[in-house]
């Protein structure tokens, strides 16, 4: 089984690093989409099936937190898990994100083994639904 993945980060370099890390971690990727902010996520999701989202917190137009809140209101978070990938990450901030419905948090720089384990855990949870 492969996953349609959406990477959300305003840095083209970070999006590239996440793509390469997915490859190094042997995550089975189907279609791969990239956008620069949370608003674009909503647009992509309206016309494509997305299995998993990797998102930054600090982005222009619509931040990762605003995106999560909007997805929660629309009940899309129930169907599409979000993994936050950020350098930001106090315990309080991470707990707040998890309460909003984020499934996991990865700190930059990303460790391929940690990414693989989190994807397996998160997607295993969703595949059982």
What do the predicted segments below correspond to?
Residues 12-33, 100:
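Two-component/phosphorelay signaling modules centered on CheY-like receiver
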Residues 34-43, 64:
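Helix N-cap/capping motif at the beta->alpha junctions
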Residues 43, 65-78:
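Short amphipathic alpha-helix used as the core "switch/output" element in two-component signaling
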Residues 48-54:
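Active-site beta3 strand of CheY-like receiver
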Residues 59:
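Receiver (REC) domain active-site loop signature in two-component systems and cognate sites
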Residues 66, 89-104, 117:
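Alpha4 helix (beta4-alpha4-beta5 surface) of REC/receiver domains from two-component response regulators
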Residues 110-119:
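C-terminal output helix
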């Amino acid at each position: 089984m492969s996953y349609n993945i959406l990477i959300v980060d305003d840095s083209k370099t970070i999006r590239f690093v996440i793509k390469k890390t997915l490859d190094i971690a042997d995550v089975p990727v189907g279609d791969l989409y990239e956008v620069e902010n949370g608003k674009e996520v909503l647009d992509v999701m309206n016309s494509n099936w997305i299995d998993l989202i990797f998102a930054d917190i600090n982005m222009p137009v619509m931040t990762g937190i605003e995106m999560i809140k909007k997805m929660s209101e629309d009940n899309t978070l129930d169907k599409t898990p979000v993994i936050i990938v950020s350098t930001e990450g106090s315990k309080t901030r991470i707990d707040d994100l998890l309460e909003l419905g984020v499934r996991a948090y990865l700190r930059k720089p990303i460790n391929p083994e940690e990414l693989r384990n989190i994807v397996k855990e998160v997607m295993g949870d969703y595949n059982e639904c």
